[in-house]
Curated annotation (Swiss-Prot):
Residue intervals of every C4-type zinc finger in the record: 10-27
Protein name: DNA repair protein RadA
Similarity-based family: Belongs to the RecA family. RadA subfamily.
Stretch list, region Lon-protease-like: 349-446
EC number: 3.6.4.-
Native species: Campylobacter jejuni subsp. jejuni serotype O:2 (strain ATCC 700819 / NCTC 11168)
Keywords in alphabetical order: ATP-binding, DNA damage, DNA repair, DNA-binding, Hydrolase, Metal-binding, Nucleotide-binding, Stress response, Zinc, Zinc-finger
GO cellular component terms, A-Z: cytosol
Binding site for ATP: 96-103
Domains: entry comment: Has a putative N-terminal zinc-finger, a middle region with homology to RecA with ATPase motifs including the RadA KNRFG motif, while the C-terminus is homologous to Lon protease.
Length: 446
């Protein structure tokens, strides 16, 4: 009798190898390979055969376009991120840290869609019906078309889907489900991958729009195989500090629209609502203090004025820390200050914080970060009427940023008077713009 071929799978990313490896060549995880049992390998082969369909090549000019049906979720922020509304039969994956409000958001959306007359099935593997009902009472989300199911078995969920003509399915969360066809534990790579595949098949076959909540790892990525994000139609990340009110919903993948928009929500006593009057949520206009500078960043099509806070203090064992800002970018800016402005930061602790719990990734905030650091180092307060916009290069030049006019218009609306920018705006905004091409010019202005 021929010996069965062994198959090992990485529990971190789903990579498969014919022999055990100490380190995964795909994701780099150590000691993550486990051997799959014969039953698991058999199921994987059967599922792979089901998904294989023969088709003929067709000339691209003969392909007929599909017209997707969209409908509003009655939430302007979510509709914005989804590209104009929810597409019928789409599969949406939402990830986020514990306590950020994923379940609260989807329960609100479930209620909105149910009030439109659509039948919604909310499946929870983490909470009881009574717990969900308590939250629904608080959110005023009770409606006859919203059905609750506390179930962990995929086959039982699919059976319930076939009983009623559901239009919306919400799964909270994908890591808690298991399939009877697979012998591995719930939340394993194989379970997550194959359950998602089955949900995708059902969504497309019956035009059921499906939301899936996914846990995230300590690195901030959605737990489970990387192929999970490739299988779904839309990938959204829910960000925010659980101790603060503002939440950001970012799109990282969207087969039916763009990914350049960000939804902004506010956590209130009645749940998540579309945030209003965002202008003063991320900065204060109080007394000028050292270590504080204001900048303007773009979040999708929005311009937001943010306060950058910096603390520089002498230390025998200097360290650098950044909250809401990239640590590697901060290290580069500190090296630039030492090299170009001869500011001796080698014996100083440097802490940088972006107020409001917002994570800044664009380089247009470089100038504001540097201004806050210099202000703290020299103990020299900066005017609250001034904003700093610009990207810094490695040679100390201040480079232009995109959407400069949009940023300056937002600053004007917030009644700022001065702007330190790399170039003049295309139109007269009504601000005093001080053009700085090099970092040394900013120091002279300060």
């Amino acid at each position: 009798m021929a010996k069965n071929k062994a198959l090992f799978e990485c529990q971190a990313c789903g990579n498969q190898q014919s022999k055990w490896l100490g380190k995964c060549p795909d994701c780099g995880a150590w000691d993550s390979f486990v051997e799959l049992k014969a039953e698991q390998i058999k199921v994987l082969k059967e599922l792979a055969q089901v998904s294989m369909k023969t088709s003929e090549a067709v000339c691209i000019e003969d392909v007929e376009l599909e017209h997707f049906t969209r409908y509003s979720t009655d939430d302007n922020e979510l509709d914005l991120v989804l590209g104009g509304g929810l597409v019928e039969g789409s599969l949406v994956l939402i990830g986020g840290s514990p306590g950020v409000g994923k379940s609260t958001l989807l329960l609100k959306i479930a209620s909105n869609l149910a009030k439109q007359g659509k039948k919604v099935l909310y499946v929870s593997g983490e909470e009881s019906k009574a717990q969900i009902k308590l939250r629904a009472d608080r959110l005023e989300a009770n409606t006859p078309n919203l059905f609750l199911l506390t179930e962990l078995c995929l086959e039982n969920i699919l059976e319930e889907l076939h009983k009623k003509d559901y239009s919306i399915l919400i799964v909270d969360s994908i890591q808690t489900l298991y399939s009877n066809k697979i012998t591995s534990a719930a939340g394993s790579i194989t379970q997550v991958r194959e359950i998602t595949f089955e949900l995708m098949r059902v969504s497309k076959a019956y035009n059921i729009s499906t939301f899936i909540i996914g846990h995230i790892t300590k690195e901030g990525a959605i737990a489970g195989p990387r192929v999970l994000e490739h299988m779904v139609d839309v990938v959204l990340y829910f960000e925010g500090d659980a101790t603060k009110e503002i939440r950001l919903l970012r799109g990282f993948k969207n087969r039916f629209g763009g990914t350049n928009e960000v939804g902004i929500f506010e956590m209130t006593a009645k749940g998540l609502i579309s945030a209003k009057d965002l202008a003063n949520r991320f900065f204060t206009r109080g007394k000028a203090i050292s270590g504080s500078a204001l900048g303007v960043v773009m979040e999708g099509s929005r311009a937001l004025v943010l306060e950058v806070q910096a603390l520089v203090c002498e230390s025998s064992y200097p360290k650098r820390s950044a909250t809401g800002y990239e640590k590697n970018r901060l290290d580069m800016l500190l090296a630039l200050l030492e090299r170009k402005l001869e500011i001796p930061l080698g014996h100083y602790d440097v802490f940088v914080n972006i107020s409001g719990g917002v994570k800044v990734s664009e380089t247009a905030a470089d100038l504001a970060v540097v201004a806050a650091i210099i202000s703290s180092f020299k103990n020299r307060p900066l005017s609250k009427d001034s904003i700093f916009i610009g990207e810094l290069s490695l040679n100390g030049e201040i480079r232009e940023v995109f959407s400069l006019d949009t940023r300056l218009k937002e600053a004007k609306m917030q009644k700022f008077k001065n702007a330190i920018v790399p170039s003049k705006p295309l139109e007269d905004i009504g601000l005093k713009c001080f053009v700085a091409k090099e970092l040394s010019q900013v120091l002279e202005w300060m």
